[in-house]
Structures are given as structure tokens and as C-alpha cells.
Amino acid sequence: MTSLSTHLNDRKLWKIDKDEVAYYRHMVFNSSIEKLIDAASSKRDKHWGNVISYSRKIFVPLTNMCRDTCSYCTFVKHPDDPDAKIMSPQEVLLSAREGEKKGCKELLFSLGEKPEKRYAKPTRALETLGYEAMTDYLTDMCKLVIEKTSLLPHVNAGTLNEYEIVKLKNVCASMGMMLETTSKRLTQKGGPHYACPDKVPIQRIRTLISAGY
């Protein structure tokens, strides 16, 4: 009998069609977790080897305001909180240069999603900086880091449309996207993603599709 590991290694999972989805779904629900772990490990090692690499990053929270209100989030600050803010270009550069001193190669821009679409405070703060949208400001901060430092920007900006992705692609080394769940149930009243427009699964999936996953 052919092993589960062999079946997986005979297929390129990144070129999967509907029939293969059904095939793997059947295997998942009819195999033990140990076999699945063994199969996944075997496939990983075959294609990527056993070397783990890393790149030192400095974390730069460009804004800790967000229009989403995920109940588990400890990063976001409500605009009424005195600690809620948008970092200035000077603060970004100061953090970047501190990262250089520590031997960092990348700068990780993390930020809440589109706070200006919900609250007045981030809207006013962006206007003071000369911007209407957080993604436009983020794009220019990536340019600033590239022009003034040796660091490579990495962006975690959440849901983006194709236009925003193209803009950011030109000024950052990589972009991250968290697909926490594909469950619509979690967006219902009482769920952790209730009243969080950017956590509706289809919105995040559309970003991945636009990025050319």
C-alpha cells in the first residue's frame, strides 16, 4: 500500500484543482494525526530542506488605531486612549536607525487597518501629515526607510486592494497577511470578529488573490 507521505510528495500542492481538494480532504478526515504530521514533515523537508533561516527585524507600529475591534487584540488602542497614535516620519527614522545599530536587516511595519475610515482622530492626524489614507502614508514611510537607511521594509497592513498592493510592492521587500480563519461564524454577534469589516474571510481571501498567491 502506498503511504500517505508518498501520495503527498507525488503532487505539487501549490497547483491544486477541485479534484485534488476533495482527495486531500478525504485523506485528512480518514487518517490519523500522526500520519498527517509525518506526511507534512516529509513534504516540507523534501522541498525546503532542514535549514531554518531568519532575518533580524525591528518592529515599528506605524499606528495602533484600527477600525476593527477584534475582542482578543491587545495591540490596538481606541482613539480615546492617550496612547493611541500614528508615528511621525521622525519617529519612524529613529526606530529604523536603532534597528541598524542592533544589526537588523529588515523593518517590520505593523499597523491597524484603515482607522481613518471609522474615527476622526486618525483622519485628522493623517491630514496633519498631508495624507488622506493610511496606506498612502505607509507607502511613503517605506520609501523613507529605503532612502535613508540600510533596512528593507516588510509590511503587515491587513486587507488591501490591488492598487494598494501594487503601490506597496515597489517600496517593500515583502508583505505579510494573516488569514486567521475562514469561518463566517466568528463574525456573528458575540464572536471575536463581530463588527470587524476587515476580518470577514472573503475580504482577506480577496487580498491573497490580488497578491497572486
Sequence positions of predicted segments:
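Structural signal for hydrophobic packing residues in well-ordered secondary-structure cores
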Residues: 12, 44-48, 74, 96, ...
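Short amphipathic alpha-helical segments, especially helix-boundary/capping motifs
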Residues: 1, 13-19, 46, 69-73, ...
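A generic short-segment signal for beta-strand/edge and adjacent turn/coil regions
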Residues: 23-30, 41, 76-78, 123-124, ...
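Conserved Radical SAM active-site core
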Residues: 79-213
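Flexible, acidic/Gly-rich N-terminal and inter-domain linker regions that tether
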Residues: 1-69
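Canonical Radical SAM [4Fe-4S] cluster-binding loop centered on the CxxxCxxC motif
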Residues: 52-91, 114-115
